[in-house]
């Protein structure tokens, strides 16, 4: 590559908590990584190829980071520059207890990727800030889902004057794909910098967590990866609260329990379980049993009650007020992971 395509990413990686993130999918299946992150549940206890958003969550409510933080006064929001019904997110986010969902249909989108299939991510800076500003004097959790870096990646040459030039792929078609991909995530890296600047300017205590939901395919194998595993991406963080840098390799279902633990938040059935039992010998067996009880069993954990019912998800901003100090947790799912490009691509 002619230059580092993700300098903002690498700066955050050097200065704030980071690590590898083991995810359940490669090449596609964003919703399943998303499900693990938001609920603290593991996809290994579901059927092969299953999407919980389209199966169990169609009619069953599910405790999540949104419902847990709502219990302590947070407003909870989703922002996504794609259609609301993709992966049945409009229903799933209600079942997981979110307050609002701002999707592509509610945004003034004017810029698209060069091949025209996805909106660019720059619009998400303004929409994320709108979510944070929608609840005055209240803490907020915002889950922002990006889409600009998503495939398909064209085999024909689309970019006539790319900001980042790529060479060394086995074929011209493969080189075109990688050059397109790298330039799209270069723009996403600009979004990262702009988002951090925007939330820092607000002057509230804020933690930003960003993670890759899956690697692209494009012929990748474990031997191509620095991590040695195509099911590992990276997560990065930022905060303006003086939190220490604590690097750790995690699974997607452990990510938010780690972040909330660092922030002094110990809410929720699943997240508290990860915080207290992650190093125990019975951890995975207990995790499987707990998931079954909450999703398919009699909910003995809740004494048989429905403690986290679905919300009336609003496709608009509603104002809620609570007399608490404002602290913000923003989670951004980045649909890319440059850190683990093949070794050929990492050569600058």
Named regions from a protein language model:
Residues 1-346:
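Solvent-exposed soluble domains appended to multi-pass membrane proteins
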